[in-house]
Amino acid sequence: MSQHDRYISPFSTRYASDEMQYIFSDDNKFRTWRRLWVALARAEMKQGLTNITPEMVAELETHVDDINYEVAIEREKLVRHDVMSHVYAYGQQCPKAAGIIHLGATSCYVGDNTDIIVMRQGLELVRKKLIGVLAKLAKFAEEYKDMPCMAYTHCQPAQPTTVGKRATLWANELVMDLNEIDHRLATLQLRGVKGTTGTQASFMELFKGDADKIRAVDASIAEEMGFDCEAVIPVSGQTYSRKVDAFILNALAGIGQSCMKFATDLRLLANFKEMEEPFEKNQIGSSAMPYKRNPMRCERICALSRYLMVDVLNPSFTTGTQWFERTLDDSANKRVAMAEGFLAADAILNIMLNVTDGIVVYPKVVRSRLMAELPFMASENIMMQAVEKGGNRQELHERLRQHAIAAGKQVKEEGLPNDMVDRIAADPAFGLTREEIVAGLVPENFVGRAPQQVEEFIANVLKPIFDANPDAVEQHASLSV
């Protein structure tokens, strides 16, 4: 079958990066299996198993990367067991060591430990891209920290903020996601050697009941695979707890939540014509409507984020339905859910890198929309001006309310501009000229500490992240479609 007459995941053809696809590839998995078999043999030899020699370990090391896939595939057709098929294939390349490969271990030794190693690699890539997105948002927030815009609550005009301050809200949620990813990486533990039901009975037999040697084997394998020697789960059944998968996918789904919020805001702002995602010179927005500038990147972020957030249910149910020391109904579900969860998170961050690299702002539209609402926002200031000239605060409050209702009616029912300033200027109770009122309608005076908040957030929250991860700051992503 060719690639055109079989189903191929869109994550592979459209969305996920080559780096993340390799992390979850068969090649990475089976090379990791072989690295684990080398680590096991070396650790057992160090603890005194005389039937394992340095020559055998060296032979195993020689063939970690040149996997004879054809042999493994043919063997699996016969024995219907992927691990034993690869033990056999490895043994064909390493005849001296063939008899000691996988000694004392169960399938989960390579399967589960590899899953943990692969997920760590995936989390590290996600982390790097997340920091890259934060760097672009920081640059954007700094550039637009002083530009006033309308803030919305209930999607209704509320009070002014700044374009840059709004960007810090997007960034702050991603910082929360980064903290969660860091926590998962810091607490991730290898399964180690636990045997068929977690009791390490086979290793007690190998080492004649010497528990210290078994603990040393665990520590040695952990170190060789890049973990702290103490980073081995203390107890398990046959598998590591599937709660680990649920925790990790929840962390990835958190990224989906934050990115979906960003993308939704940008889609709404595009409708307001205040801001929009990058739009290529030759990009076509619609096959029927040539004028369309659809926010397809942000729409894709929302689509993939929705998928990722729903994917969390898979490891949640899997964890709850593992019977006793393990059941195999985790395997098929986990194989799909975890890999595609990582691919989805990767795809989302690729688009985020692309979008945040070129957000378009239309300052005149931003200001025009703000000025259309500012007379309402400034009503209290106008009232204070009038009180200073001898007006009655309570009477003025009621008159402002009536003027606001009338001006709002003109905007909504007549489709005419907001004339509240003219109404107040014409009302002798206020004693203010139009010029005096307009002079007070300076948007920058209504944004509070927004510019300073941006500066403080970048300096106190984002800059330490960038200083600690300089290699992650400058990243770019191109999209295939």
PLM-predicted stretches and their roles:
Residues 40-43, 126, 130-133, 137-140, ...:
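Amphipathic alpha-helices that form helix-helix packing interfaces
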